[in-house]
Amino acid sequence: MKLQNSFRDYTAESALFVRRALVAFLGILLLTGVLIANLYNLQIVRFTDYQTRSNENRIKLVPIAPSRGIIYDRNGIPLALNRTIYQIEMMPEKVDNVQQTLDALRSVVDLTDDDIAAFRKERARSHRFTSIPVKTNLTEVQVARFAVNQYRFPGVEVKGYKRRYYPYGSALTHVIGYVSKINDKDVERLNNDGKLANYAATHDIGKLGIERYYEDVLHGQTGYEEVEVNNRGRVIRQLKEVPPQAGHDIYLTLDLKLQQYIETLLAGSRAAVVVTDPRTGGVLALVSTPSYDPNLFVDGISSKDYSALLNDPNTPLVNRATQGVYPPASTVKPYVAVSALSAGVITRNTTLFDPGWWQLPGSEKRYRDWKKWGHGRLNVTRSLEESSDTFFYQVAYDMGIDRLSEWMGKFGYGHYTGIDLAEERSGNMPTREWKQKRFKKPWYQGDTIPVGIGQGYWTATPIQMSKALMILINDGIVKVPHLLMSTAEDGKQVPWVQPHEPPVGDIHSGYWELAKDGMYGVANRPNGTAHKYFASAPYKIAAKSGTAQVFGLKANETYNAHKIAERLRDHKQMTAFAPYNNPQVAVAMILENGGAGPAVGTLMRQILDHIMLGDNNTDLPAENPAVAAAEDH
């Protein structure tokens, strides 16, 4: 048995220790180097990046909404203004139990089921950490009640905002329009137009009328403030502020009192009236009835209220003055006369015998005159005074649809008028091409005949009727109807500028005076179809009435409004201007199905007297309904 070596090799152990210590030291040195390198990267290389991130957590940019421009009438009366409202808002991510919080708020701020439904709808389309309205238009009592109980509702606060308000309600809805909450379509459009950033602090946008058309002018430029916040998100101090730029105030050509007066006259009727100054094209009144209160839409209309408007058989949502399309009827006869004279189809001396009907050559088809026993021998002026259909059947036949549609297009029919409202329809000025495309059928000669009296396939809006009337008054010089009078910029009024358009025909032909003389005869001469309404006026009026058929009669039938359903009765129309020798006002009017009140001539006289005399109680002769119906041609 060998003896165990009890001696240790201290030299070897020492060398091993040194090697291990060296490895450990090198490891520590390497790790320290990595740490120093990383620290250098964080503190030196990426200092700016991390400083920015830190500031973003500490410093916030808060957008500041601009004040929306005020809309005034021509006399400086505010038609759309801003007022401060308070609303309660919630950031759901800061609330432990949203439903319990909503339930608790019911008794504090009188929260309703509709309010909660609107909140949930808005929450569904909002981003996280967005403050969402719970209830708007808080009363002073509700604000005070919440202030006392605010400690119970973390994540909920009351904020003040400027809200649009329309003090005259339904009287101006179809002109002024309204603003309402920005929706997804608005966001998409603003983003595509590069304007979304300017709406960072804005809840509303123009949806209709002037508010929509002049949105860029009225909105202004969003400002912002740079604030420092603590770790709870509360503002500690303001670092910088760039104030918002308020939107521009605008002044309209409208006369509020005239607008309200006409709306009162049309109460209960489906009707439209456009009043213009033919010297400038400025719209003095644009009324469409029935209407509705635009304030309903500002904070978001309830589904119940919107459904009621949408399903109303009287269609209050439609602006009849610019979107209602009707056969223009006999109101176009003066323009057809000027066109036929200008085209050489007729002359000043052309005459025609009217037996009460006109027969299409080579056919047994007869077209009846509204006066079944006829008007006898007619020239151009008398055919306008008595509104002979037969005379204009012949004119339409001789002109043909190509020339007729071309000339009426020059008067603006079938085209947008250029009025500063997005809600406009162009109507229809029929052509061969239109019929082929629409019905896959050729144009027949018989289609042309009713076009000569503003019937058939021809449809137009009251604003188009107004523009055509101004062209006639100005002897072919075109005035675009407009609502904007001026814009307030830097303390100055910048006026709206009438665009230049080529004149219609020869402004020195004398044909314009011939047509206007015919309209003068309508209102003033014994054989004029509307003389009983206007002959007694202390100023001179020129007018032209029209009847647009809704329900077709058989050859042996006679029209009787009392035996026809109300919706099938004829539309009554009239255009007029005054004073005759120096026109200052032009009016176009339509009463759907004849209206619910006085005759169209009575209403026209009342409007003109109100403007020319300031007389709101025009004394007119008693009306015989049967005679009135016959005279409204």
Predicted regions and their residues:
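Periplasmic/cell-envelope proteins involved in peptidoglycan metabolism and beta-lactam response
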Residues: 1-303, 325, 347-348, 353, ...
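Beta-lactam-recognizing serine transpeptidase/beta-lactamase-like catalytic domain environment
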Residues: 2-11, 80, 229-239, 279-331, ...
